[in-house]
């Protein structure tokens, strides 16, 4: 957890005029007591309760401060100090007083591609530094591209407002809905995994506007704007791009690619011929077209300031973000239900197979019982035949001569013993047959 100075910022800085404001932040000019150095004090309203939507969460503030403390680059605003009180965290930032780049360019009588690329090169250098540290700005737009001093011979670009910047961790999926609708990438609109590529899309939109004074995806409503972005619905209208080089258009085309993996990276953009090669343009008609381009840029700048509050970063889409999160949760629940349904079907199929196998075993068992019964019946028939034969032999013996009387008695005795034994065996077999018949009937009933 980051620690900030638990002191009254006004004990160290004299507060001055307000420079800008957002949904939960106010920026004021300030002067350090003792040194007279001028800075910008950004007052960020803290969120008091985790469940509240008012204010900025501690986690978000700490993330912004952590990123600002890490970065040091000529084209990125510098953090000097951080204070905290009961209601606010106060960032003491480098004072960037030259105004917005687009406002500066809109004041010029003419604008060449060479001048545009000089400023764009500074933007790319700043973004290249961020991306080298795996930091994505996620809110690159004209009002976050400032000049340190517009009166300097070669004004220096400063990238500001790291309120929604994130470190992109390898192997970790990150999704969110934020940014400014006109400049966000399709993967933000579609709630897909985000990376450094989203900044490159924003640079493509900024370049398009810089060269034409027209916004490539801006619709009559925010929803129309988002639809245009998702469909990559833009073109190079001849009215706006008649004097624009093919190299410049190619630079934009390589950035405004829906698939982030196919989008030009920051390293590739710095190596693009339009950025590397400075071309001087001559001809009588070119200055007039360049003046027309600057006039259109003025119109865009005036329109954007009149239609959108300064330093507004997709705050109005927070509800949309929550809706998309709910939709994602519902889709996840649906996928789990479908998975459960598949598992139930698989279990039913397994039970059906088990029942069929059991039925087959019962049929096989019934067939075995039938074979045993037939075998016992055969044995019974043989036993009956033996009994009949014994009776016939006894009758034959009775018909013998008187001399055989003793033998006949013995035979009769033998017959009686044998008859008793046979009767017992016959009774046993009959009992066994009845038992087997009952088992067979019970088995057939169980199968049905």
From Swiss-Prot:
What cofactors does this protein use?
Answer: Mg(2+)
Which residues are annotated with the PTM Phosphoserine?
304, 306-307, 313, 321
Q: Which stretches does the entry tag as region Leucine-zipper?
A: 422-436
The UniProt entry annotates the active site at 139 (proton acceptor)
Q: How is its activity regulated?
A: A sequential activation is proposed: autophosphorylation at consensus sites is leading to dimerization of the catalytic domain and activation segment exchange (producing an active confirmation of both kinase modules in trans) followed by phosphorylation at Thr-180 in the activation segment and at other regulatory sites. Phosphorylation at Thr-180, Thr-225 and Thr-265 is essential for activity. Inhibited by pyridone 6 (K00225), a potent, ATP-competitive inhibitor. Phosphorylation at Thr-180, Thr-225 and Thr-265 is essential for activity.
Residues annotated as region Interaction with CDC5L?
A: 390-448
Tissues where this protein is expressed: Ubiquitously expressed in all tissue types examined. High levels in brain, heart, lung and spleen, lower expression in kidney, liver, skeletal muscle and testis. Isoform 2 is expressed in the smooth muscle.
- List GO BP terms, alphabetically: apoptotic process; apoptotic signaling pathway; cellular response to type II interferon; chromatin organization; intracellular signal transduction; negative regulation of translation; neuron differentiation; positive regulation of apoptotic process
Q: What catalytic activity does the UniProt entry give for this protein?
A: L-seryl-[protein] + ATP = O-phospho-L-seryl-[protein] + ADP + H(+); L-threonyl-[protein] + ATP = O-phospho-L-threonyl-[protein] + ADP + H(+)
Keyword hit for Zinc: no
EC number(s) for this protein? Answer: 2.7.11.1
| PROSITE patterns reported for this sequence | PROTEIN_KINASE_ATP, PROTEIN_KINASE_DOM, PROTEIN_KINASE_ST
Coiled-coil residues are: none
Molecular function, one GO term: protein serine kinase activity
What residues bind ATP, as annotated?
19-27, 42
Question: Is the keyword Transmembrane in the record?
Answer: no
First-listed, main subcellular location of the protein, grouped into a coarse class:
nucleus
* Region Required for interaction with ATF4 but not with PAWR: start-end pairs: 418-448
Q: Which residues carry this modification: Phosphothreonine?
A: 180, 225, 265
List, alphabetically, the Gene3D superfamilies matched.
Phosphorylase Kinase, domain 1, Transferase(Phosphotransferase) domain 1
Q: What does this protein do?
A: Serine/threonine kinase which is involved in the regulation of apoptosis, autophagy, transcription, translation and actin cytoskeleton reorganization. Regulates both type I (caspase-dependent) apoptotic and type II (caspase-independent) autophagic cell deaths signal, depending on the cellular setting. Involved in formation of promyelocytic leukemia protein nuclear body (PML-NB). Involved in apoptosis involving PAWR which mediates cytoplasmic relocation; in vitro phosphorylates PAWR. Regulates myosin phosphorylation in both smooth muscle and non-muscle cells.
Assembly behavior? Homooligomer in its kinase-active form (homotrimers and homodimers are reported); monomeric in its kinase-inactive form. Homodimerization is required for activation segment autophosphorylation. Interacts with DAXX, ATF4, NLK, TCF7L2, UBE2D1, UBE2D2, UBE2D3 and CDC5L. Interacts with PAWR; also demonstrated in aorta smooth muscle cells indicative for the cytoskeletal targeting function of PAWR. Interacts with AR; enhanced by AATF. Interacts with LUZP1; the interaction is likely to occur throughout the cell cycle and reduces the LUZP1-mediated suppression of MYL9 phosphorylation.
Q: What's the name of the protein?
A: Death-associated protein kinase 3
Please name the gene that encodes this protein: Dapk3
């Amino acid at each position: 957890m980051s620690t900030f100075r638990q002191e009254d910022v006004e004990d160290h800085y004299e507060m001055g005029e307000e420079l800008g404001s957002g949904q939960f932040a106010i920026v004021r000019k300030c002067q350090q007591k003792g040194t007279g150095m001028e800075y910008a004090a950004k007052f960020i309203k803290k969120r008091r309760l985790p469940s509240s939507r008012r204010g900025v969460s501690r986690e978000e503030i700490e993330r912004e401060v952590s990123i600002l403390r890490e970065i040091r680059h000529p084209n990125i605003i510098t953090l000097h100090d951080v204070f905290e009180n009961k209601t606010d965290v106060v960032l003491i930032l480098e004072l960037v007083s030259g105004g917005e780049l687009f406002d500066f360019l809109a004041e010029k009588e003419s604008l060449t591609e060479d001048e545009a690329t000089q400023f764009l090169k500074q933007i790319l250098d700043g973004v290249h530094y961020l991306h080298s540290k795996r930091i994505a700005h996620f809110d690159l737009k004209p009002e976050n591209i400032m000049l340190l001093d517009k009166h300097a011979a070669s004004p220096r670009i400063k990238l500001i407002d790291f309120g929604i910047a994130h470190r992109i961790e390898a192997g970790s999926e990150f999704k969110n809905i934020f940014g400014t609708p006109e400049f966000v990438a399709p993967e933000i609109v579609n709630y897909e995994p985000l990376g450094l590529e989203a900044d490159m899309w924003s640079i493509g939109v900024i370049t398009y506007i810089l060269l034409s004074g027209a916004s490539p995806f801006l619709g009559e409503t925010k929803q129309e704007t988002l639809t245009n972005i998702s469909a990559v619905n833009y073109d190079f209208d001849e009215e706006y791009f008649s004097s624009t080089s093919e190299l410049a258009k190619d630079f934009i085309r390589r950035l405004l690619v829906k698939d982030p993996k196919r989008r030009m990276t920051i390293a590739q953009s710095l190596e693009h011929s339009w950025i590397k090669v400075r071309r001087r343009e001559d001809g009588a008609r070119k200055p007039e077209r360049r003046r027309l381009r600057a006039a259109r840029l003025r119109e865009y700048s005036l329109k954007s300031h009149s239609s959108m509050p300064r330093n507004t970063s997709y705050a109005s889409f927070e509800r949309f973000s929550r809706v998309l999160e709910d939709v994602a949760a519902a889709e996840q629940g649906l996928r789990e239900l479908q998975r459960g349904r598949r598992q139930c079907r698989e279990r039913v199929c397994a039970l059906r197979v088990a029942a069929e196998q059991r039925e087959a075993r019962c049929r096989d068992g019934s067939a075995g019982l039938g074979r045993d019964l037939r075998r016992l019946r055969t044995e019974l028939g043989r036993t009956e035949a033996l009994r009949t034969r014994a009776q016939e032999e006894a009758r034959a013996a009775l018909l013998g001569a008187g001399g055989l009387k003793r033998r006949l008695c013995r035979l009769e005795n033998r017959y009686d013993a044998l008859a008793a034994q046979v009767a017992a065996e016959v009774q046993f077999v009959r009992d066994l047959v009845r038992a087997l018949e009952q088992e067979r009937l019970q088995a057939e009933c169980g199968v049905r």
